[in-house]
Amino acid sequence: MTPRFDLIGMATTDMARTLDFYRRLGLDIPPGAESQPHVEVTLPGGIRLAWDDAEMVRSFDPDWTPPTGSPRHSLAFRCADPAEVDRWYAELTEAGYEGHLKPWDAFWGQRYAVLHDPDGNGVDLFAPLPEAD
């Protein structure tokens, strides 16, 4: 048997703010989870997404420090249509989350935008552009 991809784990320095961000994007995160040091949800298709607070990470990796600089990964959320990309970007930035790249029509045929979650991780919003007539 070969290993099977199963979980994306992220460290967070503010569990409540992080979970609020991902709840706004539609993830079904249980109420009260923000008080836990480890939270995970199962996404459609079975992949799990998990967050550990800084103290939890340091419990098994005492030398861990939050990364700095630009994100090295991003999570991409498909929206229903290009207008939804704009709407979600506006809603999240108006709620105080960091917008990195405002929505644009990408040359690869998608409406695209990039935000950062509260820990600076890249979060992309995208939707296919209508085909040109």
Regions found by a protein language model. Give the residues of each.
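Glyoxalase I/VOC metalloenzyme domain signal
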Residues: 1-6, 11-33, 43-98, 116-133
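Short, small/polar residue-rich loop motifs at catalytic or cofactor-binding pockets
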Residues: 107-110
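Active-site/ligand-binding-proximal alpha/beta "capping" segment
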Residues: 101-104
